[in-house]
């Protein structure tokens, strides 16, 4: 049967968690990894792999987090030079902007040296999932300028939505924290969180559900299990960015295409067991956007829907991107998805 993940089809967190968990299992060396929604009135996300029951899946997640919680991992690396002085993670795509050419060169040198280290260290693995996430997150855009100056944040993945208040960044203040939390759990606690038997939100120290940001924008603020959030944030790896000289980098699933603050995320709903590669191909396709947005061209929408159906999709999900009114550190989060069956 496989692991049935906690969460509704109308929550982007559930799709991201399925994609992230599938990637983690492939990085563990699992064979025939599959994921998809059940064909039911209330669909559930199911992830399977040959020889992996719920406990084995949880062990893989635990080992994955433990390896990245250790000192010296890429998640543990900070930018050492000014203006960061060890207070920003090396691979966070949104950090304090460099103020000079030497600072930009320092940032690029540190990033490239560590990427080279990752490539050399992972040559024998079947799949280097770390580089997949690093690449998908994007990077500070040294090439982007506008009338009012540099725009380094335009090189970042739009689904990396950690608020930047108090100088916080995605990896140092979220991914690194979750790695340690999941590493400190045992397999049974990880299973419980992933399948929804319990919701343990160790990353949030308060008592009000509507103030927890553990989901990091993939849902509206609410209590979120840390293991589920860990998998979901690795799901960002399935949403690559394409950098552009003359505009903000394009992130898969973001609508309008190329807008710095998109209005919507569009996801496909694949029913049945599909490979991660199939999911990723559909996620980045123009057809998934056309099916959800081609109001002016019925022919284009029909063609897109036919293509999606041929690739396993039954519907699309459209999520509104909510943005707070804080001008200094605007908070983005995804609302509930609008499910639309393919015509």
List the model feature ranges, each with a label.
Residues 155-157, 190-218, 234-247:
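Short linear interaction motifs
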Residues 1-187, 204-208, 229, 237, ...:
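Conserved small-residue
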Residues 7-10, 220, 224-227, 231, ...:
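Elongated scaffolding segments in large macromolecular assemblies
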């Amino acid at each position: 049967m496989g692991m049935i993940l906690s969460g509704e089809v109308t929550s982007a967190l559930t799709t991201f968690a399925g994609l992230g968990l599938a990637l983690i299992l492939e990085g563990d060396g699992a064979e025939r990894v599959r994921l998809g929604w059940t064909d039911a009135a209330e669909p559930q996300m199911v992830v399977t792999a040959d020889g992996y029951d719920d406990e084995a899946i949880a062990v893989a997640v635990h080992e994955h987090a433990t390896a990245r919680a250790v000192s010296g991992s890429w998640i543990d690396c900070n930018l050492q030079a000014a203006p960061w002085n060890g207070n920003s993670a090396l691979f966070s795509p949104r950090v304090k902007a460099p103020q000079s050419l030497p600072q930009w060169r320092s940032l690029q040198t540190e990033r490239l040296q560590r990427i080279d280290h990752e490539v050399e260290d992972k040559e024998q693995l079947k799949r280097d999932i770390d580089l997949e996430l690093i690449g998908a997150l994007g990077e500070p855009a040294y090439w982007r300028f506008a009338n009012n100056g540099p725009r380094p944040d335009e090189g970042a993945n739009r689904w990396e939505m950690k608020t930047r208040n108090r100088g916080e960044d995605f990896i140092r203040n979220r991914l690194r924290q979750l790695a340690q939390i999941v590493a400190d759990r045992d397999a049974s606690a990880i299973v419980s969180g992933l399948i929804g038997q319990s919701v343990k939100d160790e990353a949030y120290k308060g008592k009000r559900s509507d103030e927890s940001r553990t989901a990091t924008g993939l849902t509206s603020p609410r209590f979120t299990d840390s293991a589920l959030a860990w998998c979901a944030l690795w799901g960002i790896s399935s949403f690559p960015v394409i950098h552009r000289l003359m505009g903000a980098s394009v992130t898969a699933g973001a609508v309008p295409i190329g807008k710095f603050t998109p209005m919507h995320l569009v996801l496909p709903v694949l029913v049945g067991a599909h490979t991660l590669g199939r999911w990723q191909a559909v996620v980045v396709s123009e057809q998934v956007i056309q099916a959800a947005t081609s109001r002016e061209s019925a022919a284009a929408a029909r063609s897109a829907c036919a293509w999606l159906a041929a690739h396993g999709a039954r519907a699309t999900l459209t999520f509104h991107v909510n943005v707070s009114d804080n001008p200094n550190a605007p908070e983005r989060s995804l609302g509930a998805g609008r499910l639309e069956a393919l015509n």
